[in-house]
Amino acid sequence: MAKAAAIGIDLGTTYSCVGVFQHGKVEIIANDQGNRTTPSYVAFTDTERLIGDAAKNQVALNPQNTVFDAKRLIGRKFGDPVVQSDMKHWPFQVINDGDKPKVQVSYKGETKAFYPEEISSMVLTKMKEIAEADLGYPVTNAVITVPAYFNDSQRQATKDAGVIAGLNVLRIINEPTRTIAYALDRTGKGERNVLIFDLGGGTFDVSILTIDDGIFEVKATAGDTTWVEDFDNRLVNHFVEEFKRKHKKDISQNKRAVRRLRTACERAKRTLSSSTQASLEIDSLFEGIDFYTSITRARFEELCSDLFRSTLEPVEKALRDAKLDKAQIHDLVLVGGSTRIPKVQKLLQDFFNGRDLNKSINPDEAVAYGAAVQAAILMGDKSENVQDLLLLDVAPLSLGLETPGGVMTALIKRNSTIPTKQTQIFTTYSDNQPGVLIQVYEGERAMTKDNNLLGRFELSGIPPAPGVPQIEVTFEIDANGILNVTATDKSTGKANKITITNDKGRLSKEEIERMVQEAEKYKAEDEVQRERVSAKNALESYALNMKSAVEDEGLKGKISEADKKKVLDKCQEVISWLDANTLAEKDEFEHKRKELEQVCNPIISGLYQGGGGPGPGGFGAQGPKGGSGSGPTIEEVD
């Protein structure tokens, strides 16, 4: 068997995507619904857990227990202003557990609380299963992408989510790495400056790369860490006000109504990318009132005009950081679903004086595409398409330590190419100081109190000579963007170090181990549920097929009334039993099926012995393919 491939996963805020590099090219893998992107949604019901399309399809029926946007929680504190702001829009409950946010849901009749890492791990597990179903063998190695502006704890938390999902995370890479996809499709030689404009479901960043003969150097990244795709929110608020004007009723506190409205708004927003007008038709939205309305593209652009304009600020910042003029940018690449909005494209085009935008990459798939290529490189793929590619990524934030007066002294500057290592000599501040406290920060502000504390450690046993000791401090970032800090007293050789992997926001080894075991348990429960539903569907399908077989007009005179009655009575008995026992176990359904077969098989096989008919049990008995098989497969939202 060929060596198992590593996969590239774009773990998105609203949608996720998985790709694999094989036979010299990237394949984006479709899920069991035939979709190449999968909603980053997890739903909990009284009977099961649903992930992806199945979870999103039932969101209007079960808004409190359907979790999305976990990426906006991951690696953040509960008190973070972004978390507090987002909580106002979410129908599910977020609780505080020692300043770590947890999502509280009702699952199988019990109240459960999950860390964002656990929710993200469930989405990653789904992406892993999608890849395995396509490739036909177990997959463990993966590259996972994060936004360029993600800080250390957000990167670590994403890596933890991968571990909980049973993945060996080869590397956490910045999403702009996806331009590898772009470069693979380019045959032109010579140095080119490329600006990637990435506007997704909950993240927004801009990167500038220089590509020269297979070497990618990230010159600058800029992003809006507080960005949330407010386009949907603006539409929702607009229609809530319209409903209030028309019907004198406020629907904003009704979670189901708001969820149905949001789904319709999301659809309208997509329609407005290709049409100048979109209609919304939602039956019985609130208190039996049907809501039929429409919106023009011009009105949508007016509602979001400030948001559209604000997307140019990170573009200007990235150009300043890269020390480039906009005329020096050769290519503009659009990534992320929201770049399909015509107004966004026009603003960007006007800013770059009418320059053509590169739309050759599918914006939804570009990230997974780039991640799949990176996974192949890390696994030692020797295809000529990838062997000459080298990606030089950058540190998204400055890293340094606190010096007297609370001053931030940066050793690694923002946008430094990684991996990197920087060393600087410090001395003791006061006479006869026996030890130094090394406090490590990330951020761009002059004072450490305004930056993010990553960790601290002490170097003790320093000889008590005033201002003489020489302390050598080394900051080293590896290719995953993970930081090691070492301090050495040059006179004694004493050293101490810290790996910034376990700041207060991070899960402990024990917690991760527990979550891995729980993930296995949930997966096993999901499998039991799938088998149960499959057995139920098989029984129902068999009973209905037997019923229609003996009622077939073509069999008149071939089957005695007594036999016909026997089959119909037994089928009806089974159908009634099914209606009353929808939550029965797999073996109960199988037992009922055997009972039914014992009655039907002798009669049916007698009928078909002469001709090649369906034969005993030959009708259906398969149940629906794919999916989790239970609950509503579609839910009408409009």
UniProtKB/Swiss-Prot annotation:
The UniProt record describes its induction as: By heat shock.
Residue positions, PTM N6,N6,N6-trimethyllysine: K558
N6,N6-dimethyllysine PTM positions read K558
UniProt modified residues of type Phosphoserine: S628, S630
One function term, GO molecular function aspect: ATP-dependent protein folding chaperone
Q: What does its PTM field state?
A: In response to cellular stress, acetylated at Lys-77 by NA110 and then gradually deacetylated by HDAC4 at later stages. Acetylation enhances its chaperone activity and also determines whether it will function as a chaperone for protein refolding or degradation by controlling its binding to co-chaperones HOPX and STUB1. The acetylated form and the non-acetylated form bind to HOPX and STUB1 respectively. Acetylation also protects cells against various types of cellular stress.
Q: Where is this region: Substrate-binding domain (SBD)?
A: 392-506
Q: Which residues carry this modification: N6-acetyllysine?
A: K77, K108, K244, K346
Subunit field text:
Identified in a IGF2BP1-dependent mRNP granule complex containing untranslated mRNAs, IRAK1BP1, KTU and TSC2. Interacts with TERT; the interaction occurs in the absence of the RNA component, TERC, and dissociates once the TERT complex has formed. Interacts with CHCHD3. Interacts with TRIM5 (via B30.2/SPRY domain). Interacts with PRKN. Interacts with FOXP3. Interacts with DNAJC9 (via J domain). Interacts with NAA10, HSP40, HSP90 and HDAC4. The acetylated form and the non-acetylated form interact with HOPX and STUB1 respectively. Interacts with NEDD1 and SMAD3.
Family, according to the entry, reads as follows:
Belongs to the heat shock protein 70 family.
Q: This chain belongs to which protein, by name?
A: Heat shock 70 kDa protein 1
